[in-house]
Amino acid sequence: MEWKDCHVERADWLLTPAQRGNPASRVDRRHADGAAWSTGNDVRPLVHGAVYFAELLAAVRAQRAGDMLMFTDWRGDPDELLDGPESAIGDVLCDAARRGVVVKGLVWRSHLDRFQFSEQENYHLGEEIEEAGGECLLDMRVRPGGSHHQKFVVLRHPGRPERDLAFVGGIDLCHSRRDDAAHQGDPLAQPIADAYGSRPPWHDIQLAVRGPAVGDVEATFRERWTDPAPLSRSPRSRLRATLRGEDTRADPLPVQQPDPDPRGPHTVQILRTYPNRLRGYPFAPDGERSIARAYTKSLRRARQLIYLEDQYLWSESAVQPFAQALADHPGLRMIAVLPPLPDQEGRISTPMNLLGRIRALEVLRRAGGDRVAVYSLENHAGTPVYVHAKVCVIDDVWAAVGSDNVNRRSWTHDSELSCAVLDETRDSREPMDPGGLGDGARVFARELRLSLNLEHLDRDGDKEAAALCEPGRAFAAYVDSAAALDAWHDGGRQGPRPSGRLRTYHPPRLSHLTRALTDPLYRVIADPDGRPRSLRRHGAY
C-alpha cells in the first residue's frame, strides 16, 4: 500500500456517542460537533511514577490564586514524596490551597483497613487538604464491594488556558509509585507479597494531556462532584464521619472554563466504567461500560500485533474480544506483560487472584496458541517487578492508557477512566501500514509501544527502534530475550547476565478442588460483575 493511501478514520476505531451507551453523560453532549471525542490535543506518555510525579509537582507549584486543581484517587498517602525532600503530596496540595488555588478532591472511602485497603490514609490526606482551605471528600458511592478506581488530576488556569493540563492513567498519589526505569522501588514503599522485597519495583504509566480533552476530563470530575447522593449510605461510615467532623457536602464549583485551544495532532476519547447500581448515578443511570465497548470495537481491527501491559488480565468474558480477534486472524500475535505474582499472598487470596488469570490465559491460548506470549519483568538484581501499568496498543494505530485493567471488575463494577488516543501524524518507518487496512502506523501509538519494548529489552537508539517497528520482529525479540534470561536463571546464574528484563510467564497450576472452592470467592470478591442482568445474560457490555 502506498504511503499516500494511509488514512485513519476516527469512527473506525473510536466509539460514536450511541456506541458509548450512556446518553446521560455530558462528556459527548458538550461537544459542539456532536463527536464522542476531541481533536487537536497534545498527549505525552509518562512512563514511571517518578517521571509523572516530577511533572505533577512542577505543574502544581506553578499554579496561583484563582487557578483550579481537581483530582480523584483510589489511595492517597499524604507523606508520599513527589520529587525529593519537601515534596510530600499532602504538603504540595495544602500549599496550593493556601496560595488561593481552588483544590477539590474525590478520594475513595475504602473498606476497612484490615482488608488491606486505604481508609485511614485517604482520610488523613483529605483532612490535611480541608485544614488548608481545600475540599477533599471521601466518596463511597459505589456498588457493594466496589471502589472508585479513577486516577486523574486536572489543572485549570483562568486567563492562562495555555497552561491547562490533565494527567490520566493508573498511578495513585501514594506509596510505592515513585519508581523509575531502573526499577529499584520507591523508598516509601507499601508492603506487598514478600517476593517483591521491601522496596517493590513498580512499573506504571500516566498520560499528560493538553488541549480540548482537558475539558472532557474535567467534565468527568464535575459529574461525580455534583452527584446529589450522600457520599455513603452505610450507617457506620456516616456515624464515623459525623464523629470526626468530616466534610460530607460538596461545595459548588466555579463555572467550567472554555476548553483549551487545540495544540496538537492527537484525537482523544475519554472512556469510563461506572457500575449499574440500585440508586444509579445521575450521569450514568444504568452504568457506563465504554472502556469494554472501546476494546471490543478496536480489537475487531487488530491484524498484526496486540501489545498489552496489565496488572491482572483476568476473566474469560473480558478476554473474549482478544480471543475472537486471534481466532479470526491467523497472522495476529499478542504480547502481554503482567506481574509474575499477585500483590497479596495467603491461603485464600493467592488462589483467588490466580484463578481469573489462569482461565483467561486458557481462553487466549485456545484461540491463538503460540501466537500469544506472556511475560513478567525483573530488575537487573533479579527482583520481580510489579506491573501496575494499564496500556494497550493495537497495530501501532490505537492506544489506550488508563486506570482500568482487563478484567470484569474494571470493565463493569468499579469507576474507571481511560484515554484512547489516535494520532493524526503517520509514522514514516516501515512497515507504514502494519495492519494492512489503510490506517497507517501512527506516531503516538508506535512510539509508546517502542519505548516500552526498548526498556524491557535493555535496548536503545533509533536503529534498534526501527527494527522493532515490524510486529513479527518485536514478537521474536521478546521471545528470544526472555528465553536467554530464563536459561541463565535455570543454569544457576553463571556468567554474565543476559540483557533484558523479560521472563516467560508460566501460569501456576490449581487443582480442580482448589478451583471449585475458590470460584465463588473469585466471582464475588475479586472480579465481580456490575452489569445489568440483561447484559449479563447476553454476555454483552
Residue ranges and their predicted role:
Residues 1-541:
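Charged, low-complexity intrinsically disordered terminal segments
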